[in-house]
Amino acid sequence: MPAFARTIGIDYSGAETPTASLKGLRVYLTEGGAVSTEVPPPPSLRKYWTRRGIAEWLVERLAEDVPTLVGIDHGFSFPLRYFEVHGLLPDWPAFLDDFQRHWPTDEDHTYVDFIRDGSFGHGAARQGNARWQRLTEQRAGGAKSVFHFDVQGSVAKSTHAGIPGLRFLRQRLGPRVHFWPFDGWEVPSGRSAIAEVYPALWSRGFARDGRTSDQHDAFSIATWLAMADRDGSLATFLRPRLSAPERTVAQVEGWILGLAGALDSSGTASMVEDRGAGNSLH
């Protein structure tokens, strides 16, 4: 029996400000075994979602008594090296507060680049290095550092924009939502959960069907999460094959849901098997 009644896939964007209407922000939802469908933003003058709008919508959805698994495609934390360099305790909730104080990317009229160039915030006191990678990025093979800005496929800007949003969700929802794996590798029965995902693991396995790349990434997230939940494989990916020390690190740095954890002969972590195009939830 599936653990979650619905899944939500979010293709994120760190462009512009928290209230900017962004074409790259896309949300798909899967419920009741049906095909994933796009969720439009609430009626307003804005054509597309805003980061703040998505956060507020998630608060409403996750406050409902419907076990929901949400996958968001930006980094949820930083490499352990970052904590060491800046003298921070390896504590994720404390990290969220500290990061938002220095990188208040959730504030009105604030671009990530405003903080990068020193015109706002205190980002200079909390810098990272593009050579620093989390364990999960090393195992993913191809995933870029959360500090690797200004390159194709970078998640740095979306990560720096998105982490304060996670803090907002945690403050508003409290224990109602399980932030995986920071709150533990096991998601309590009946609880909703939010996890970091990497849609490149799955997107090639589904037919594009006229969707834009952003739409397809969000569709792939929601669809794969629902399929994995229904066929029982999700439980395996929620418990990746990591040593005890690796698990300790990953509960600070975070982990990409969909990576099994153990290295294969090529030095890359085992990943979800590629599901053929045209598969459905039925």
Language model features with spans:
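RNase H-like (RuvC/DEDD) metal-dependent nuclease/polynucleotide-processing core
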Residues: 1-8, 12-282
